[in-house]
From Swiss-Prot:
Highest taxon of the lineage: Bacteria
Protein name as catalogued: UPF0162 protein BU173
NCBIfam families recorded: PRK10941.1 (NF008188)
Family from the record: Belongs to the UPF0162 family.
Length: 269
């Protein structure tokens, strides 16, 4: 397991960061077999697209290989959200989320020198390919489909607000650290929902390493500590949140939680 103190995301690629983060969260994360499988898939992809000369045709063939031949795609039926986020599991089942599928596809495409970048759109991760003629493709990592402006506007209105509008900066390339945070935030929520509190705590500690003073991450860590009955440290974190975000409506709920923990401590003593 990687020590949190040794991780420096600024020196790692997006894919390396996700592997290192997964090792830090899960002792049994099989990074060697994940890297070996991806190396083999990159070799296969290189051969599959080699008959094409133009980058856009190469990317078209890679999309066909990934989503049709290899059959990667979104999960359906009954499943645990965390199972669709762990990269080792996604490689095994070929079912993932926009962010996990996007990270795998992006790693393969970039290894093949294709001009693809991540975009943390307000509703989900999308992939952006920029071509020499200034045209761009926006790709849905769930299924490999090319997205048009109308679809993106519908997503915004359906998920954010009926009055939401699509702005150019919604489609700007995102920094790796933004994608990592998106992935870790989703994973943390999934693990908390699944009551895997020790793993959720590891995720939260990683997020706090990225932004040590984020009161919302500190609040979540406090809530996880409370679930684990580590009441002393839970109180410290929850009080920090209330002091730093007094105007947040959630603060009133957190104050009740603080009072409940303090009552428990009084009874125990």
């Amino acid at each position: 397991m990687n020590s949190l103190s040794n991780i420096d995301f600024s020196k790692l690629s997006l894919f390396e960061s996700i592997i290192v983060a997964s090792q830090a969260i899960r002792e049994d994360f099989p990074s060697h077999s994940v890297l070996t499988e991806l190396k083999n898939r990159i070799k296969e992809a290189e051969s599959y697209i080699s008959s094409e000369n133009e980058p856009d045709r190469k990317l078209e063939k890679l999309l066909q290989l990934f989503y049709t031949q290899w059959n990667f795609g979104g999960a359906s039926g009954v499943y645990k959200l965390s199972d669709t986020l762990w990269i080792d599991n996604v490689l095994k089942t070929r079912k993932g989320t926009a962010v996990s599928l996007g990270i795998i596809f992006l790693h393969i495409a970039q290894s093949l020198k294709l001009p693809l970048n991540p975009v943390v759109f307000p509703t989900q991760l999308i992939l952006r390919a920029d071509w020499i003629n200034e045209k761009k493709w926006l790709i849905n990592p769930f299924n490999g489909e090319i997205l048009d402006q109308h679809t993106l506007e519908v997503w915004l209105k359906g998920n954010i607000s009926p009055t939401a509008e699509l702005y150019e900066n919604d489609l700007y390339k995102s920094e790796s650290i933004t994608v990592i945070r998106k992935m870790l935030d989703t994973l943390k929520a999934a693990l908390m929902e699944e009551k895997k509190m020790e793993l959720a705590l590891n995720v939260t500690n990683l997020l706090i390493k990225i932004d040590p003073n984020d009161p919302y991450e500190i609040r979540d860590r406090g809530l996880i500590y409370a679930q684990l009955e580590c009441n002393h440290v839970a109180l410290t974190d929850l009080i920090y949140f209330v002091e730093h975000c007094p105007e947040d409506p959630i603060s009133e709920i957190i104050k009740i939680q603080i009072h409940s923990i303090e009552q428990k401590k009084t009874i125990l003593h």
